[in-house]
Amino acid sequence: MFGQRQSLIVYLHSLKHAKILRKYGNIHYISKRLKYAVVYCDMDQLEHMMHKLNKLPFVKRIEQSYRPFLKTEFENSRPDRAKEYDYS
């Protein structure tokens, strides 16, 4: 149903132009203090979108999110202490 998606962190010179980013993907978050926007786009169009966004005059730099590539299953994690006790 849904394809693989990845977020791009787009650093801007000014937030005035943040609305223009809507046509390049779904805007998830805009930080006013740090002047960046998190834009989601399809994985297969990622390189193309980065190239198009880098051409825009109000974009400082773009970084890919590494969240899809991080391992989220941890091996030697300690069990929950509350679940150790059997209260039955």
UniProtKB/Swiss-Prot annotation:
Record carries keyword Cell membrane: no
GO cellular component: cytoplasm
Cysteine disulfide partners in this protein: none
Domain of life: Bacteria
Keyword Zinc: no
Record-linked Pfam families: DUF2129 (PF09902)
Primary site of residence: cytoplasm
Localisation per UniProt entry: Cytoplasm
Protein name: UPF0298 protein Bcer98_2635
Keywords: Cytoplasm
Family: Belongs to the UPF0298 family.
Species annotation: Bacillus cytotoxicus (strain DSM 22905 / CIP 110041 / 391-98 / NVH 391-98)
InterPro entries xrefs: DUF2129 (IPR016979)
